[in-house]
């Protein structure tokens, strides 16, 4: 039997509702189908409650975030993580002090955080091999509803045809901070995609539980 070296990788998602750490084990051939989940931790900091209403993340929540990132760094050491990617999404994009907080995180924890735009966020959803979930020769609209934004990916015949992101999410909606023009843009785009790609199946993923 051939023994393959296994290594652990981590992903940190600083979202509008929660901050997640996912650690997965892969073999040396980096075959996605052989990946296995080692650990998943989700802590609800609700950064979007500040970012979407007052435009900044409070000092209290910034301190909690930094403490949490220190804990995540220790967990990555315990699990012998060889590499990681840390991304911040809608709340940190909107917060005026988002970039300053990222600088404090790297200064106090050594963890490098990227504030990614909505388009990159949508592509990351697709890069999670979601096309493998769907039958070839058909059209699918994959909708990922988060706390601060909603990403849609149009997949036709196993290929990504369109990716878009909208500032519509559960935390924004509960805070009453979703703009009417954003709702109209989503509605118009959905009608357009459904008209162009007929018939179409919709897969709805809700990634921002309370």
Question: What role is predicted for each listed range?
Answer:
Residues 39-82:
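Phosphate-binding loop and its immediate beta->loop->alpha context
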Residues 5, 117-141:
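Conserved phosphate-binding catalytic cores of ATP/NTP-utilizing and phosphoryl-transfer enzymes
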Residues 5-30, 137-162:
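Gly/Thr-rich phosphate-binding beta-strand-loop-beta motif of the actin/hexokinase/Hsp70
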Residues 176-204:
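ATP/pyrophosphate-binding catalytic subdomain of soluble kinases
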Residues 19-57, 156-182:
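Short glycine-rich, Thr/Ser-proximal phosphate-binding strand/loop in the N-terminal lobe
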Residues 206-210:
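Conserved small/polar residues in nucleotide/adenosyl-binding loops
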């Amino acid at each position: 039997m051939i023994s393959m070296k296994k290594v652990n990788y981590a992903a940190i998602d600083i979202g509008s509702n929660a901050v997640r750490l996912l650690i997965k084990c892969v073999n040396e051939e980096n075959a996605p189908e052989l990946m296995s989940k080692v650990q998943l931790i989700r802590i609800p900091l609700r950064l979007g409650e500040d970012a979407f209403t007052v435009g900044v993340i409070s000092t209290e929540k910034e301190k909690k975030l930094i403490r949490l990132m220190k804990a995540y760094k220790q967990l990555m050491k315990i699990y012998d993580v060889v590499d990681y990617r840390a991304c911040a999404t809608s709340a940190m994009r909107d917060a005026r002090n988002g970039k300053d907080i990222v600088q404090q995180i790297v200064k106090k924890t050594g963890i490098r955080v990227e504030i990614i735009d909505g388009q990159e966020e949508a592509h990351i959803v697709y890069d999670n091999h979601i096309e493998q979930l769907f039958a070839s020769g058909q059209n699918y609209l994959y909708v990922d509803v988060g706390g601060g934004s909603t990403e849609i990916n149009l997949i036709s015949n196993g290929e990504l045809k369109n990716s878009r992101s909208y500032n519509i999410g559960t935390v924004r909606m509960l805070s009453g901070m979703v703009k009417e023009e954003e709702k109209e843009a989503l509605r118009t785009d959905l009608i357009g995609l459904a008209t162009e790609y007929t018939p179409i199946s919709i897969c709805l993923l809700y990634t921002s539980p309370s």
